[in-house]
Curated annotation (Swiss-Prot):
GO molecular function term, any single one: DNA binding
Organism: Aquifex aeolicus (strain VF5)
UniProt comment concerning the protein's domains: Contains large globular domains required for ATP hydrolysis at each terminus and a third globular domain forming a flexible SMC hinge near the middle of the molecule. These domains are separated by coiled-coil structures.
Family note: Belongs to the SMC family.
Lineage: Bacteria, Pseudomonadati, Aquificota, Aquificia, Aquificales
Protein name: Chromosome partition protein Smc
A single cellular component GO annotation: chromosome
Highest taxon of the lineage: Bacteria
UniProt keyword Ribonucleoprotein, yes or no: no
Amino acid sequence: MEKRAYIEKIVVEGFKSYGTKRKEIPLGEGFIAVVGPNGAGKSNIGDAISFALGLSSAKALRAKNLSYLIFSKNGQKADHAYVEVHFKNLGAFPVEDEEVVISRKVSKDGRSIFKINGQVVRERDLKDFLAKAGIYETAYNVVYQGDIVKFLKMTPVERRKIIEEISGIGEYERKKEKALEELAEVELKIKEIDLILEEISNQLKRLKEEKEKLEKFKELQRIKRETEAKILLKEKEKLLKERERILNELSSLRESLEDITFQIQENEKELNERERLLKEVNEKIMPFKEKVGKFTAEIENAERSIKEKERELKESENRVKNLEELINNLLSDKENLEREVGTLQLELEKLKEEYKSLKEVEREKLRELEEEEERLKITFDEVKKLEEEKEKLTEKLNSLNKEKQELEIQRANLKNKIERIKEDINKLISEREEKIKEIKEKEQEIKRLKAIKKKEEEELRNLTQELNIYEKRLSEVRKKLEEVLKEKGAIEREVRSFSDVSDVFKDIKGVYGSVSELIRVKNPEHITAIEVAGGGRLKFIVVEDEEVAKECIQLAKRMNLGRFSFIPLNRVRVEERPLRYPRTKGAVDFAVNLVEYDPKFEKVVKFVFGDTLIVENFESAKAIGIGNYRMVTLEGELFEKSGVITGGAVKPSGELNKRYYEEELQRLNAEEEKLKNEESIIQKKIREIRNLISEKTALLKVSERKIEELSSEGLEQYEEKFKEKLENSKEYLKILEEKLLNVEDKLKELAEEIEYYEEKLNNLKLKEGDIKRHYSREGVEEKRREYSKVRKQVSEIEKSLNEIERELNKKTYELEYLEKEIQEKEREREYLTERIKSLKKEIENLILFKEKTLQEVKEAEVKVYDYIKQKEELEKEILNLKSKLGKLKIKEEELKEKIFEKEKNLKVLEEKIENLNEELKEYEDLKLGADEESIPKLKEKLKRVTEEIQKLGSVNFRAEEDYAEELKRFNDYKEKQQKLKEESKAIKKLIEETENKKRKVFLEAFNQINKSLKRIFSFLSPGGKAQMFLDNPEDPFSGGVQLTVKPRGKDVQYLEAMSGGEKTLAALSLIFALQEYKPSPFYYFDEVDAHLDEVNAKKVGELIREKSKEAQFIVVTLREVVTSFADKIVGVSARGGISEVFFLKNEGLEEIIKEA
């Protein structure tokens, strides 16, 4: 089913001439004619449609601005202008509703509101909505009064854009834009990789130098190691010789030492015997000594262990005791807290009752006590004062202890906070490193993107300049080509008007042609003068001989062609004389010298022109002398030698012009071909540049978007934020630490204060005890205790009543803290309880062991006494023998010292040799041959090599690995670059395919519309022709669409030269051709038939009637012949300046037309 729509009705309110009331103008399908007198408001129907659909500006609607569209006349003024256009939707609009209402309201301040079916929309959204139904921004379907020729006055590009819009190639444009954006993304990545590859290339160059430096370093190191190894081998050889000498000396010294050693051995045998006996005694003593020593050590260890374990036991028991007490207290506190939290309000009431009761008892007890004291004449003030002071001290201590507890909780909280802040600071510092790395990477990428953007912007500027140059050149070429084509057309017409007299004889052998055909005027300015100079002789036909002339004459007679003159080459005679003319100003030259010809026809040319002199003008001829020469001026005046002067208007015969025009035509054809080739080349270049500009523009948009995305936060901004966070954290940490110090100081002060008050309270208690003892002696103490007890209870209740509200707020927090504390203390108590059991067992075992060991020591000391006496006698004998041996050993020692010195030197040598061997192990991988160089020379060589190594400076020992890694990275990026280039190539291919499809769709639309245009115009103007052609068929989007019209009986002419009726027919033909390709839901024509005669108006009416079967036509007309074809006639009249609408039948039309 064909999709279409039409306007059912228009609703206006406060719009232009239609007054302030809401009015409906029914329209309907088919051909609707709108008629009425001039000024009645007919055109305002079309203005209302255009206004509501946003198809025209205020200027096009004949208003200064939109607020001028609001009705205002005779003091009446509407608040707004409002128009509704009701469409019957038969599938044209992309909604399911059968009725589509589009409305627009403009207020006095010029603001507009558009709506579709009651929903407010933007103007852009409305235009998109209308375009889907075939109502476009170009509004080719709306023709205002006197505006029909706008379709002819359109520039070729505007005409092309209408066809583009109707052909629906927008989808291809969107695909192309999307592909261009994808291409820009890929190209941007390629550019980034290009920069990275450039960076890597620089790195590779540097690393290659470092690698070569490392290789040189390694070579020098190899030479250095070889030289070092050779030096070590030479030094080892020297040390081996020295060792051999010392070994020989040692051999002699050792022989002397052996003799002394023998004497010493003999004396030592005897000494040994005594020492053996001493040893036996010692061995007998030793077990006892060892046993005693062992027992003593064990006893000491046991005592030490007992002390340590007893100390640990005592500490653990004390700690357990403290813990149990603390846990009991904590549990008690916990129970109290739990009970108090649950029953605090009830307890408060109970305490108040109890307080009231106790207060009464207190007063009674106080009265009894005072009576007793009065009886004993003892004042109770002092006791009461002590009681109050003690109570105050107790309260103060309780308050201080509570404050201490709160401070301890506060201290724990502060420590936790300090730890958390320190952790946060460490975390912040750790995160900073990662963030800085991330920001630096982003900054590097931004740097690359900005470099690419800068380069691309520069290239875009250059391309734009280049495009402007080429477009300017293209415009010049096209202008020049147009001039060439005009000139060529004029020349072609001139050439066609010529007829060669020699053509009838062209088949006869020996005929060369007319004189005019055989010569060529050198300068076009001389053509008129040469034609006059040659006169009728220029038409003479040149033949070979008289026989040929005879044959031609006979042919002319047979065919009754008229008379001809012939010049036989074998008979022509000329007078040979030198041609001289006075060298006077105004003389040009003899005519024979101003033409070109074949030397074969020289006599003919001289015969025709003789001695005729060409001069510039009449005055020049007079100056030379009339009658002296046969002369012709450039304007054609002829001066005969006889004095006869011939002149006046000269009508060119064209005999010479033909040759000139033919040559000029050849030149122009060549120039046309050249210009067309140049045009094609320039167009191709412009296409390439435009494609590049599109790619560069898309790439710049993508790079700008990426730079914006990456530029969220720079290193400087982050560092500022980091420093601020760090400083804030450190400041907060400092504040917390200061608070902690303050809390610690307060706790210290509280401890001192608590200690002071506790001591003071003890003193008061002692003083109170003295008084109470005095009272007890007097029988008052009992009453005093009763009173104190009651007084204490009252005080406690008062204290509870005062504190209960304050305590209630702390209970929950303290309860949580107590539970944690209890759990921790219970775990510690369990551990210590087990430890105490273990310690007690260990101590018990150690005491038993100690007692047993002491008993064994006593028994051993009795047995060892006799052995000690024998030991003392043997020690005396041994001392004498040792004295004798002393002298021998001194001599032995001297020898040994010498041997030792030698051995020491030998050892040093061997150590050196060993060290050299160790050092030489580092050079085991070297293959060294015999070297005759001395150590000094080798050291000199080593020094030289070392200096060369130092000259190399710092060496990158990872150069080879770095080079390999960077080369791999380079190759990886190269591979990525290749893949991206392939992707870019694929996208470009897609763009090209899309462009080809777009071109194909456009050309199909163009060809179909052009075909319809030819047919419709030939119908409206029989014998006439109209067609469109593309400026550039190969690339239609680089040029425009030209329109040529040839009305019946006329040549092709410029549109400006056509009559109003001809222009109307041409414009309507184009509109109907567009309508045939893609009909708009409606067409609005306002007096498009104004310039048409009756016949053409009738044809237009017939055509509209025919086309109205496919689309709605709303036509404002004053022509009865047009209206006669309408399906419905809407009449418009004006009463009191307000337009009214009514329906007419064709019979009432004539009257309306006459009124108009």
